[in-house]
Amino acid sequence: MNMKKLNVTLAILVAAVMAGNAQTSVTSDIVGYSKIGAPSGTVALVPGFVKSPKFAGSATLSGQSFAVTMPAGELNQSNFSDRPNYPTHYIEITAGDYEGYAYDIVANTPTSVTAANVPSAINGQTFSVVIRPHVTLDDIASASMAEYSDAVNLINPDGSTTTRYYAAGSWIAEDFSTAAGHTVIYPGQAVLLSSGGVEIITTGVVKTTKTAVPLYAAAVNYVGPLSPSGDTKVIQLQIAPSLAVYSDGFNQFTTDGTMTTIGTYYSDGVDVLDAGFSPLPSTATDSITTNTGFALSAGADGYWIMPSPLSR
């Protein structure tokens, strides 16, 4: 039986970019675009890129505020006030024991940013960080989508579902009137895209560091690798240490629009196990398709520390 599958075309180039800090040296970011052909039906879609940083450098944490120095106007209060209900930027630690952990920015001054839910255990420490704009639903909007019909579902930490509909080049909320294109898609989060078949072009930067993807006990977690340039083998996910042994698990789906389960996996704390609780061998070819996700159930809140696609 021939099944129509998610098709992905990728273009990658290396560009020298300057993060928004005069004291930060020029670095080479890997930027590019993916052309994603999503079939009719539903797919778990993961944007494979992040956005270029506005700041890269060191920051010292005091309470919930990170001390940074950015050019005037780079990040001002309007960045937050014009986006009700959703943050526009986040600060992420890029090295050390907390590499990959990110926190939404809720306010800022010219010399600091205040973030939400920063753990008190790291107060007073200095970190290497980046500040990036969030990827949003507008970044996956496509003119090939059907207005008021094609939609995405996002699963919230409490297990509830938020639905957004495509309209007029952007997205609207469940009331079919409130603008919602600024709805955030967090790194590693999958959205459930239901459509009649669309082509989506995403652009951005390949992430070169780890990503701490939140896992919630109260929800089915739709998550997936940030890998815009190729499928990711299940044994490359490095997810086993994040799962409770023999109880937490995840399901892999087809990408033909039917979301039929084709693989179930568990953990022994070290290795990923198949549905029969046998460790996957190093030769296992089970893979997560580029720009797609899987459904994970966790018995307790935690994080999956996802490796950079460049480390595979």
Where in the sequence are the language-model features?
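Autoprocessing Asn-cyclization modules and mimics
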Residues: 26-133
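Charged, amphipathic alpha-helical scaffolding segments
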Residues: 163-206, 271-312
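Hydrophobic residues embedded in beta-strands of well-ordered beta-sheets
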Residues: 66-68, 111-113, 161, 170-172, ...
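Sec-dependent, cleavable N-terminal signal peptides
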Residues: 1-24
